[in-house]
Design a protein with these regions (language model features):
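Juxtamembrane inter-helical linkers in multi-pass membrane proteins
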Residues: 171, 179-183, 268-282, 317-318, ...
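Peri-membrane helix termini and adjoining interfacial loops of integral membrane proteins
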Residues: 34-45, 116-128, 218-227, 268-275, ...
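Short cytosolic juxtamembrane segments of multi-pass membrane proteins
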Residues: 270-281, 361-362, 528-536
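Flexible interhelical linker loops that connect adjacent transmembrane helices
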Residues: 4, 263-294
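Glycine-rich helix-loop "coupling/hinge" segments at transmembrane-helix boundaries
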Residues: 113, 212-238, 476-504
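Membrane-water interface segments at the C-terminal ends of transmembrane alpha-helices
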Residues: 7-41, 50-163, 191-216, 245-262, ...
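Short helix-to-coil transition segments within interhelical loops
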Residues: 163-192, 359, 437-458
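Short amphipathic alpha-helical coupling elements at transmembrane boundaries
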Residues: 45, 90-93, 126, 167-175, ...
Length: 536
C-alpha cells in the first residue's frame, strides 16, 4: 500500500520558521554590516581610548541608578496601591501602564516645563523668595526622566505579584495577627523577590539602551551613552567605522543583558485559591498615612509633566501651528508608519507563537524556547544599532533610499515584537490548553483554526498588542533620527527640530498633539473588540 509523502517541514512549523528566519537574518545582516565597517586598525589603541571607556562606564552607571531608583520605591508604592481603594485608582493604574509607551520627547518636554530653569517649580520658588538650583540636564535629568518612565511600570508589575498571593495566605496571616514587617517578610516578600530581579533587569536594559532621553537631557560629553555616541559618530562626524565599533559594543552589552533578563525571568506559579478577592486593608492610622503619602508622591511625579504639556500646548501659537502643512504632513507620516509597523509586528509575533506553542505541545521545549528567543533577540540590537546597520548596509550597496518609510516601518515592527510577545504569549498557551484536543478531534487546523478559534478568542490581547506596537512606533525617535530629513518627518522628529531651533511655543503645541494622538490611538485600538466581547 502506498504511503502518503510527509512534508519536509510540517505546516504548523512554517510560520514560526519564516518569522524567526526573517528576524535572525535581519539581525545578522545588520551585525555583518557593522563588522565590515568596524575599524581594522590597532584594537589595543581602541580599547585604551579613555573617552570610550568613560562612555561605557556612564552607560552602565546611569542604567544601574535608574533601575535602583525605580524598583526600590516601586515596592512600597505597589503595596500601597494593593491595600488602598480610592476614586481614580483604575485611572492611575492605567496611567502607570501608559508611561512605558509615552513618547519620550513629550515626557522630556513636560519635565523641562516643570523642572527647568524657567519651569513651574522655578517660578514657584521665585515667588517664595527661594533659589531654584536643580538642573534637568546631565545625570540628574536623565535619572529623573528614567524614573518617570519606569517607576510606574515597575509598580504595576510588582502589584501583579501581590495580587497573585493566594487569599488563604493573607487570611491566615490576619488570623495570626501578622502585621507590618513580619507580614512583609513572610507573606509578600517571597512573591516580590521572584518578580524584582526580572523587573530590575528589564529596566536596566531599557535605560542602558536609552537614546532620546539622553539626547535631550544629556547636557554634554560628561553625560553621553553608547547610543548617543553612535548617533554623534554618524550625524556629526560621519565616522561609520567608529559608529560600527560602538554599535558592536552596544550589541554585545545588550545581548548579555537580554540573556541575564531571560535567566532571571522565572514564572511565578499562580496556584489555586478560593479567596482570590480577599484582602486585608491594614487600616492602622500610620499605615493609611504612609500609603497616602506614597500615592500622592506618585501622582506628583506623573501628573505635573503631563499637565504641563497640555497647559503649555494651549498657547497663542496654537492656531498658527495648526495651520502649518508641515505639521499635518508629519502627523500623517507618523500615523502611516505606526499602523503599518503595528500590524506587521502583530503578524510576526503570531507566527512565532503559533509554531512555538506547537513545539511545546509536542514536548520540544528547547526548540519552542529558541523560537520565542528569536523574537527577543532584537532587544540585543536597540533601534539606533539596527538603524546603524541598515544605514551602513544600504550606504555601501544600493545607496540610501529617497523615502525611508519601509526601513522605519520594518525596524519599528521588529523593535515592538518583544512587547507583543509578552502580551500574547500566555493567552496563546491558554488557548492551546483549552481547545487543542477539541480542534484535533474536529480536524480544525491551519487557517481554519486561526479564523474560528484564535482570532475570536484573542480579540482583546490582539488589540492590546496592536495598540502597544502602534504607540511605541508613533513615539519612536531613535530610528527616524538617522533617516529623517525635511522631506521625511514624523511628529517626534518635527518636535525635535522645533526644540533645537528654540521654537518652544510651537514645540509645545506639537508635543500636545503627539500626546493626544498617542492616547487617542491607544484607546481606540484597545476598544476595537468591543466592551462585551466574549473570549470563550
Amino acid at each position: 500500500m502506498a504511503t502518503r509523502r510527509q512534508p519536509l517541514i510540517p505546516g504548523w512549523l512554517i510560520p514560526g520558521v519564516s518569522a524567526a528566519t526573517l528576524v535572525v537574518a535581519v539581525a545578522l545582516a545588520a551585525f555583518l554590516a557593522l563588522w565590515w565597517n568596524a575599524p581594522q586598525g590597532n584594537w589595543v589603541a581602541i580599547w585604551q581610548d579613555s573617552y570610550l571607556w568613560h562612555v561605557v562606564r556612564f552607560s552602565f552607571w546611569q542604567a544601574f541608578l535608574s533601575a535602583l531608583l525605580s524598583v526600590v520605591p516601586a515596592i512600597f508604592l505597589a503595596r500601597a496601591l494593593y491595600r488602598r481603594r480610592f476614586p481614580g485608582r483604575l485611572a492611575l493604574l492605567r496611567l502607570c501602564a501608559m508611561t512605558l509607551i509615552l513618547p519620550v520627547l513629550v515626557a522630556v518636554f513636560g519635565i523641562l516645563s516643570v523642572y527647568g530653569r524657567q519651569g513651574w517649580l522655578a517660578s514657584l520658588c521665585q515667588s517664595l523668595g527661594l533659589e531654584w538650583t536643580f538642573s534637568p540636564y546631565g545625570l540628574q535629568g536623565i535619572l529623573l526622566a528614567h524614573v518617570f518612565f519606569n517607576l510606574p511600570m515597575a509598580s504595576r508589575l510588582l502589584l501583579q505579584a501581590l495580587e497573585n498571593i493566594p487569599g488563604e495566605q493573607r487570611q491566615l496571616a490576619a488570623q495570626l495577627g501578622m502585621r507590618g514587617w513580619h507580614f512583609f517578610r513572610f507573606i509578600e516578600w517571597p512573591w516580590l523577590r521572584r518578580q524584582i530581579p526580572p523587573v530590575a533587569a528589564l529596566i536596566f536594559m531599557l535605560c542602558f539602551a536609552s537614546f532620546a532621553t539622553v539626547l535631550s537631557l544629556g547636557g554634554g560629553p560628561q553625560a553621553t551613552t553608547i547610543e548617543l555616541a553612535i548617533y554623534q559618530a554618524l550625524s556629526y562626524d560621519y565616522d561609520p567605522a567608529r559608529a560600527a565599533m560602538l554599535a558592536l559594543i552596544q550589541m554585545v552589552c545588550c545581548l548579555g543583558l537580554v540573556l541575564l533578563s531571560q535567566r532571571l525571568s522565572k514564572a511565578i506559579a499562580p496556584g489555586t485559591t478560593l479567596l482570590q478577592g480577599w484582602r486585608d486593608p491594614d487600616d492602622r492610622l500610620h499605615s493609611r498615612i504612609c500609603d497616602t503619602v506614597l500615592i500622592v508622591l506618585a501622582l506628583l511625579l506623573l501628573l505635573p509633566p503631563l499637565l504641563a504639556v497640555i497647559v503649555d500646548g494651549l498657547n497663542r501659537q496654537l492656531p498658527e501651528v495648526l495651520a502649518q502643512p508641515v505639521l499635518w504632513q508629519a502627523l500623517w507620516t507618523s500615523l502611516r508608519i505606526a499602523l503599518a509597523a503595528g500590524v506587521l509586528c502583530v503578524v510576526l509575533t503570531m507566527m512565532l507563537l503559533w509554531s512555538s506553542r506547537e513545539l511545546r505541545a509536542r514536548q520540544k521545549m528547547l526548540a519552542g524556547q529558541a523560537m520565542e528567543m528569536s523574537g527577543m533577540l532584537i532587544l540585543a540590537m536597540p533601534g539606533i544599532v539596527l538603524a546603524t546597520g541598515f544605514f551602513l548596509l544600504l550606504n555601501n550597496t544600493i545607496g540610501l533610499p529617497q523615502s525611508a518609510d519601509g526601513i522605519v516601518i520594518f525596524t519599528n515592527a521588529l523593535m515592538a515584537i518583544p512587547y507583543a510577545l509578552k502580551v500574547l504569549e500566555n493567552p496563546m498557551r491558554d488557548i492551546t490548553a483549552r481547545y487543542s484536543m477539541l480542534c484535533q478531534s474536529l480536524g480544525i487546523e491551519g487557517w481554519s483554526r486561526l479564523k474560528v478559534v484564535e482570532l475570536r478568542a484573542l480579540k482583546r490581547p490582539l488589540a492590546q498588542a496592536l495598540a502597544f506596537a502602534c504607540v511605541l512606533s508613533i513615539g519612536d525617535f531613535g530610528v527616524v533620527a538617522l533617516f529623517g530629513n525635511d522631506d521625511f518627518r514624523t511628529l517626534p522628529f518635527y518636535l525635535y527640530q522645533q526644540i533645537g531651533s528654540y521654537r518652544s511655543q510651537d514645540g509645545a503645541v506639537t508635543a500636545l498633539i503627539l500626546l493626544l494622538l498617542c492616547f487617542l490611538l491607544f484607546t481606540v485600538i484597545e476598544k476595537l473588540p468591543g466592551r462585551n466581547v466574549k473570549t470563550d
